[in-house]
């Protein structure tokens, strides 16, 4: 993957060389991964971590049946909005009843997974793409909706902005290892190469 990306994009390749290996943390438990990502939407990582730890403590075992049995008020009391609590409950109930087959996602192509996940209330394209990366370990995901990826691209290529056309050109250049490129773009956006800030 790294050798391929280095050969396809000299700027990204040089950045990868300087940054070194990046470990991708994955969560193979798709049920908890969906909930974790719903909790993390538009909140700080610290807030996400706090609410997540509270949910784990309150639920004990994080399985569909346990979460589906929790009252919305109990979820809300953990530090999330009522709407987010309702999204999580609806998802947990669908997973518990079998109306949403999480295991089937592993057998689907990326587009089908995105369509299936975004059919859930509270799961938009960005959340679904993060689940492809961190839950299903898909190799070729670069999210247009991820502001840090766009910032990493702007920094790396010294651009004022990244439009849809430029983004698509870069995404195709990174393919079939877009996920690895995404990890490095996130690192760049977070200051891994101070000279680019």
Predicted regions and their residues:
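C-terminal accessory module of base-excision DNA glycosylases/AP lyases that mediates lesion recognition
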Residues: 1-22, 86, 110-112, 125-197
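Non-catalytic, well-ordered alpha-helical scaffold segments
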Residues: 32-37, 49, 82-89, 129, ...
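Alpha-helical ds-nucleic-acid-binding substructure associated with the helix-hairpin-helix region
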Residues: 11, 43-121, 173
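A positional/architectural concept
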Residues: 6-40, 44-53, 57-60
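Short, surface-exposed helix-loop/turn micro-motifs enriched in polar/charged residues
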Residues: 23, 47, 67, 102-105, ...
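Short acidic alpha-helix initiation/capping motifs at coil-to-helix transition points
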Residues: 28-31, 65-67, 106-109, 143-146, ...
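A general alpha-helix detector
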Residues: 33-38, 54, 70-74, 112-116, ...
């Amino acid at each position: 993957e790294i050798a391929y990306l280095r050969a396809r994009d000299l700027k990204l390749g040089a950045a990868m060389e300087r940054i070194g290996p990046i470990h991708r943390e994955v969560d193979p438990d798709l049920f908890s991964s969906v909930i974790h990502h719903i909790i993390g939407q538009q909140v700080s990582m610290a807030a996400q971590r706090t609410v997540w730890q509270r949910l784990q403590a309150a639920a004990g075992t994080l399985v569909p049946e346990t979460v589906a049995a929790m009252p919305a008020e109990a979820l809300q009391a953990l530090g999330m909005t009522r709407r987010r609590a309702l999204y999580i409950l609806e998802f947990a109930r669908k997973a518990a009843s079998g109306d949403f087959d999480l295991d089937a996602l592993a057998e689907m192509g990326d587009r089908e997974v995105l369509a299936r996940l975004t059919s859930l209330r509270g799961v938009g394209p960005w959340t679904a793409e993060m689940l492809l990366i961190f839950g299903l370990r898909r190799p070729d995901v670069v999210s247009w909706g991820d502001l840090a990826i766009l910032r990493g691209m702007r920094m790396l290529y010294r651009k004022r902005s990244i439009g849809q056309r430029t983004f698509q050109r870069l995404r195709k250049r990174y393919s079939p290892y877009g996920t690895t490129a995404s990890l490095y773009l996130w690192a760049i956006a977070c200051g891994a190469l101070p000279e680019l800030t």
